[in-house]
Amino acid sequence: MKEIIFPKSLKKGDKIAIISPAGFVEEAPLQSTLNLIKSKGYEPVFGKHTLGKFTNGYNYSGTEKERIQDLNWALNNDEISAIWASRGGYGCQHLLRHLKLSKFREKPKWYI
């Protein structure tokens, strides 16, 4: 059986990536999340398409390519210590086949 590897504990000053891997989200409802993150001493960092809008029968935060770019950026960026999905749900399953997990396996992160 493989050993479970947990991410390191977060410390003040760590960066938390805010991404939207599924539906779009407005900035105003995210404000309480940003306030919470900042109040704990962490630095929220938005993905390039976190507040994007793309409609294709469903209101996504971006095209599939844009959403996977944000997710892979957050997973593989050494400066990011945790990932906070602004919302999840429908649309996320389309991204799984595009995940690039090489760095993530070496340095796992909390996914919230």
Residue map of PLM features:
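Short, glycine/charged-enriched secondary-structure capping and boundary segments
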Residues: 31-33, 97-101
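Long, hydrophobic/aromatic-enriched structural stretches that serve as scaffold segments
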Residues: 69, 73-99
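ATP/NTP phosphate-donor binding region
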Residues: 1-79
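General beta-strand structural signal in soluble alpha/beta enzymes
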Residues: 44-48, 84-86, 111-112
